[in-house]
């Protein structure tokens, strides 16, 4: 598995992952043109995770297993947004690897104070993954997304730099200024 910056030629694979039918109620989906515009914007960073192709195919070929988009790279508030993260096949470790890479980039490379995301409230599996990385529940955006004539609520979650640091240094307790129940 290898994580690297996405290239324009990766966009068709990114679009294909976004348009997996099972993801329809969990993530947004852009056109190739929208991704290319976002990729050209220096306030965004795209990452892909490449996995070894196995089976009958050549072993030196890699396939794009997932992607992540960071937004707010130049935020004066040092608040970076995980706009999107998705993998082709769940439960193979690619999503967690992408999330860890995105967190590392946000906090260690871009010196973020806050790393945040929104997730469909009904996406319990994703919410549990984020909670396992100490993301805190910040609130909701009620009925913020309209899909197929039905409104969906988004949960807002975030991780602060001191919480990220305490994860990296076992035994160090993050100081919080607000109770989270």
Enumerate the language-model features and the residues they cover:
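Extreme N-terminal starter segment of soluble prokaryotic enzymes
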Residues: 1-2
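Conserved beta-strand-loop-alpha-helix junction that forms the acyl-donor binding cleft
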Residues: 88, 117-127, 144-150
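Conserved active-site alpha-helix within GNAT-family acetyltransferase domains
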Residues: 96, 122-139
């Amino acid at each position: 598995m290898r994580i690297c910056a996405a290239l324009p030629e990766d966009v068709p694979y990114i679009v294909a992952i976004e348009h997996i039918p099972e993801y329809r109620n969990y993530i947004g989906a852009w056109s190739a043109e929208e991704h290319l515009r976002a990729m050209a914007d220096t306030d965004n960073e795209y990452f892909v995770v490449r996995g070894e192709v196995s089976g009958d195919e050549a072993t030196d070929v890699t396939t794009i297993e997932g992607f992540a988009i960071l937004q707010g790279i130049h935020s004066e508030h040092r608040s970076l947004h995980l706009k999107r993260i998705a993998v082709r096949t769940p439960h193979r470790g690619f999503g967690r690897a992408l999330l860890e890479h995105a967190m590392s980039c946000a906090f260690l490379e871009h010196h973020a104070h806050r790393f945040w995301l929104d997730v469909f409230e009904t996406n319990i599996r994703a919410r549990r993954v984020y909670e396992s990385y100490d993301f805190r529940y910040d609130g909701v955006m009620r009925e913020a997304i309209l899909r197929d004539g039905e409104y969906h609520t988004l949960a807002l979650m975030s991780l602060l730099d001191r919480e990220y640091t305490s994860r990296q240094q076992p035994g160090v307790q993050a100081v919080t200024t607000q109770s989270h129940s």
